[in-house]
Amino acid sequence: NDCDMYKILKKLGKCGCFAGVHCENAGVIDALIAEAKKEGRLGPENHPLVRPDTMEAEAVHRLLVIAKEADAPVMVVHLTNKKAFEEVMRARANGQEVYAETCPQYLEFTCDVYKREDGRNFVCSPPMKGQESQDALWKAIKNGMIDTVATDHCPFQSYEKDWGKDDFTKIPNGCPGVENLYPYMLDAANSGKITFERAVELCSTNVAKIFGCDNKGSISVGKDADIVIYDKDKDFTISVDNMHSDLDHTIWEGKQLHGYPIRTYLRGNVVYDNGDFVGTPGLGEYVKRSPRKH
């Protein structure tokens, strides 16, 4: 509730932290879901209808008003639509410290996917939105107005998605994405949609800066040697058959990429090489973060 949100944001601000917040108006959405069920509208094509742009934008607006009163920075996670983004820009214009994140699924797919036979596989919240919103997100990315691109990775197997084949409200919400984030954003750079520098900022540099990961985010003296080698001429088609995640489907099936990562170094150690994980179990380390200054 708003009272708790105010208290939490204020406490986090004083501690040098900030909250990443999922923004949708749950109360109105519950009412819209009840109306849809009463009217017998139970297919996945109704998922974006009961979670409209306005209910995300309203929640973003309310969050930012409360954050301003609490004098606290905040991040709006998995931003999906133009109206919600306009609320972020309005708050920034008033001097607020607001970060915005979006995800590849919102940059690639629109709400039309819910009309497909496999539409239930795309059910996530917030849902994919219309073409106008997708265009606005790409424009914001190009202009540097969106800070990071993440995945909201939350996969389910087909049998789990099938729980809602007769009632979209029973479909577990979430899609896979973590394995395809860098390939997708680097493909956008390779095709000229954005620059390679911008892709790196969105997926690495900005993330490290915002979250205080001082040893990460760039190739420079004193930083960890976390490096991706990218072959811009290698063609790759995403399929569940060539993914490393233990899944029986992916919403990215058949997506063609021009260019693909061929090697990954973690602190100077090769952990991925031409499609194979070659890292040693236990090589990972705790990443200490620095407190923020607001």
Range-by-range predicted roles:
Residues 163, 167, 221-287:
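C-terminal cap of metal-dependent C-N hydrolases
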Residues 29, 85, 108, 157-159, ...:
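Glycine/Thr-rich phosphate-binding loops of Rossmann-like dinucleotide-binding domains
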Residues 124-127, 151, 267, 273:
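Thr-Gly-centered strand-to-loop micro-motif
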Residues 286-294:
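Short, solvent-exposed cationic patches
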Residues 41-71, 121, 143, 147-149, ...:
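His/Asp/Glu-enriched, well-ordered alpha-helical/loop segment
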Residues 24, 80, 103, 154, ...:
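Anionic group-transfer/hydrolysis microenvironments
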Residues 1-149:
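Histidine/acidic residue-rich metal-binding segments in metalloenzymes
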Residues 4, 177, 181, 244:
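Short acidic-hydrophobic sequence patches enriched in Asp/Glu that either
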